[in-house]
């Protein structure tokens, strides 16, 4: 509205000046539109100011400094063209600035996402390497354990059994270290084996001790019926399992039978240390077990 009112006032002033400007050769008033440059210039200035007001509203009410003065000082066409170019340049400068600001906001987020993806890929590669190493170790470890019993011949097993003893009535809470310490005075101990139930994992109450020489076996027999963890243990030489005889462990009754068989010399001596009742239980128990497991 200010632009329109200023244009109207300027136009009225210019019109009065044109009328006062005197008469031409014929004595009449001079036409402002023919010779006076203010006539057409005033019209162009009005259009320019109107267009400037519209542009200022379109841009958002912000106009560059010196627009009106440039429009007044220059010609109508030149001033309007200069203002349009100036406005276009300002718009072009503002738009790239806004895009640049958006890019500066998005770039750190993209970089963070890319960095996270790289970290996840590195972790996946490390996990694959660890898994491959574990698989290699698992593939390499079973063969030595499985090859031991296969490589050992019957003669070697018999020789190892000749250096071993059977220890019965062992406390269920006993450990291999405690047994080794109990028989340490008899000689060098190579291995201590405490048998456990394969279903429950609980100890069966007996163990095998392997010495480095046969002399240690004879020395260890002196600990027969000695106290170990409050129990009187039974110490006898270990028997070698012969081919054709079942090696399945049937628990404590079999261990008692093995202990008796090791001291067997005659039929009368076999029955001398035991009452008929336990003997009958052992026999009937073994018979029932055999009948139960006939399908196997």
From Swiss-Prot:
Could you tell me where the Acidic residues compositional bias lies? Answer: 84-97
Keyword terms of this UniProt record: Coiled coil, Cytoplasm, mRNA processing, Nucleus, RNA-binding
Which portions of the sequence form the region Disordered?
Answer: 1-102
- Superkingdom of the organism of origin: Eukaryota
Q: Name one GO molecular function term.
A: RNA polymerase binding
RRM domain ranges (all copies) = 163-240
GO CC annotation: what is one? cytoplasm
Q: Where in the cell is it found?
A: Nucleus; Cytoplasm
Keyword Nucleus on this protein? yes
Quoted from the entry, the domain comment is: The RRM domain is essential for specific adenine bases recognition in the poly(A) tail but not sufficient for poly(A) binding.
Q: What quaternary arrangement does the UniProt entry report?
A: Monomer and homooligomer. Binds RNA as a monomer and oligomerizes when bound to poly(A).
Q: What is this protein called?
A: Polyadenylate-binding protein 2
Q: Which organism is it from?
A: Xenopus tropicalis (Western clawed frog)
Q: What is the lineage of its organism?
A: Eukaryota, Metazoa, Chordata, Craniata, Vertebrata
């Amino acid at each position: 509205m200010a632009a329109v009112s200023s244009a109207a006032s300027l136009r009225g002033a210019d019109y009065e000046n044109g009328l006062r400007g005197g008469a031409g050769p014929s004595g009449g008033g001079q036409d402002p539109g023919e010779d006076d440059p203010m006539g057409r210039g005033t019209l162009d200035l009005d259009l320019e100011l109107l267009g400037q007001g519209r542009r200022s509203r379109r841009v958002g009410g912000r106009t560059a400094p010196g627009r009106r003065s440039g429009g007044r000082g220059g010609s109508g066409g030149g001033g309007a063209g200069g203002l349009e170019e100036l406005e276009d340049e300002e718009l072009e400068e503002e738009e790239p600035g806004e895009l640049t600001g958006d890019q500066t906001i998005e770039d750190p987020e993209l970089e963070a996402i890319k960095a996270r993806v790289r970290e996840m890929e590195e972790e996946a590669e490390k996990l694959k390497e660890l898994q491959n190493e574990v698989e290699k170790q698992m593939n390499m470890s079973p063969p030595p354990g499985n090859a031991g019993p296969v490589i050992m011949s019957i003669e070697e097993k018999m020789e190892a059994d000749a250096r071993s003893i059977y220890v019965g009535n062992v406390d269920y809470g006993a450990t291999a270290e405690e047994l080794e310490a109990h028989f340490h005075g008899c000689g060098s101990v190579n291995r201590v084996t405490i048998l456990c139930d394969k279903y429950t994992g609980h100890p069966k109450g007996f163990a095998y001790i392997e010495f480095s020489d046969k002399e240690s076996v004879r020395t260890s027999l002196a600990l027969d019926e000695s106290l170990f963890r409050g129990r009187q243990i039974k110490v006898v030489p270990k028997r070698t399992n012969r081919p054709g005889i079942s090696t399945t462990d049937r628990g404590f009754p079999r261990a008692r039978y093995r202990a008796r068989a090791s001291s067997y010399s005659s039929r009368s001596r076999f029955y001398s240390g035991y009452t008929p009742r336990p003997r009958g239980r052992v026999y009937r128990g073994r018979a029932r077990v055999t009948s139960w497991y006939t399908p196997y």
